[in-house]
């Protein structure tokens, strides 16, 4: 559960309505793989990840980034039940994929950076603070199965 004020929730929802999930998802996942290269080990089947340009232009990275942000969108629609919303993904990432749950926090922080880049001055410090709460809540929900 994420504790947002009514104003924060409205601002988060309003901005998210402007997000191009295809573009932002691919960029966020791509940046995660470039900035934290050890995360690439979970994506060995994606082909060429040998350079930042290769990562950022990789169609499988873009497609999976879109999928990730689709799940994030579901989370935004269920902020009062993030653990329930992400229960299956938490189980998959823990039991089958063995993803270090710290990676969820890293991806959330990268997503906030990408949103700031895309929205510039519209992404105010107050909106950033609200999004940090959301990505922390999502990361916590995804890590729930690990506890």
Curated annotation (Swiss-Prot):
The modification Phosphoserine is found at residue 45. Red blood cells. Heme b binds at residues 64, 93. Residues 3-147 form the Globin domain. GO terms for cellular component: blood microparticle; haptoglobin-hemoglobin complex; hemoglobin complex. The modification N6-acetyllysine is found at residues 60, 83, 145. One of its GO terms (molecular function) is haptoglobin binding. Coiled coil: none annotated. GO terms for biological process: hydrogen peroxide catabolic process. The modification N-acetylvaline is found at residue 2. The modification S-nitrosocysteine is found at residue 94. Keywords: Acetylation, Heme, Iron, Metal-binding, Oxygen transport, Phosphoprotein, S-nitrosylation, Transport. InterPro entries: Globin, Globin-like_sf, Globin/Proto, Hemoglobin_b, Hemoglobin_oxygen_transport. The modification Phosphothreonine is found at residue 13. Heterotetramer of two alpha chains and two beta chains. Involved in oxygen transport from the lung to the various peripheral tissues. Belongs to the globin family. This is Hemoglobin subunit beta. It comes from Ateles geoffroyi (Black-handed spider monkey).
